[in-house]
A protein has these predicted regions:
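Catalytic core of pol beta-like nucleotidyltransferases
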Residues: 1-40, 49-54, 64-132
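Glycine-rich beta-strand-to-loop/alpha-helix junction loops that act as flexible
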Residues: 44-46
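Short beta-strand->loop micro-motif that forms the acidic, two-metal-ion catalytic signature
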Residues: 59-63
Length: 132
C-alpha cells in the first residue's frame, strides 16, 4: 500500500475540538508509522463503520513486533507513549497497542474476554501494514 506524506503540525493544533478529516487520520497514521514502526494499524469504531460525526474520536489498533521497545511496557503505558506523539491535538484519540504475539494469542486462545479485538480485526479498516 503506497503512502503519501502529509505535512501536519500537531504542535500547533488548538485545544478546542477540531474536525477530524481524512487528512488528519492519515497524518496520525503516518506519525505513528514514523515514530513507532508498527506492523499494522487498524481504524475501528464509528469512523470505520461510517457513522462518525465530524468531531468523533479516532480509534486505532496498533500492532507492534514483540521486539519493539513499546512491547516492554504495560498496555496503558503503551497508550501513553502514543498519545505523547500528539500534544495539543484537539481531537479524541483512543489507541490499543498490542504485540503480534498478543494478537496471535487472542485469535487462538480467545475465551470471550478479547471479543473487541476480534471484532476490530474482522471489521476494522487497515490503514497501514508493513510489507513482508
Amino acid at each position: 500500500m503506497p503512502t503519501v506524506k502529509h505535512e501536519f503540525d500537531f504542535g500547533r493544533i488548538e485545544t478546542r475540538p477540531k474536525q477530524v478529516t481524512p487528512e488528519v487520520i492519515r497524518a496520525v497514521c503516518e506519525r505513528i508509522v514514523d515514530k513507532v514502526n508498527p506492523e499494522k494499524i487498524v481504524l475501528f469504531g464509528s469512523r470505520a463503520k461510517g457513522t462518525a460525526s465530524k468531531y468523533s474520536d479516532i480509534d486505532l489498533l496498533v500492532i507492534i513486533d514483540r521486539k519493539n521497545p513499546l512491547a516492554l511496557l504495560k498496555g496503558r503505558d503503551r497508550y501513553g507513549q502514543i498519545l505523547r506523539l500528539f500534544p495539543h491535538r484537539g481531537f479524541g484519540l483512543d489507541v490499543i497497542v498490542l504485540t503480534d504475539e498478543e494478537v496471535h494469542n487472542v485469535i487462538n486462545k480467545n475465551e470471550g474476554e478479547w471479543d473487541l479485538i476480534l471484532e476490530i480485526l474482522n471489521e476494522g479498516k487497515t490503514l497501514y501494514e508493513q510489507k513482508a
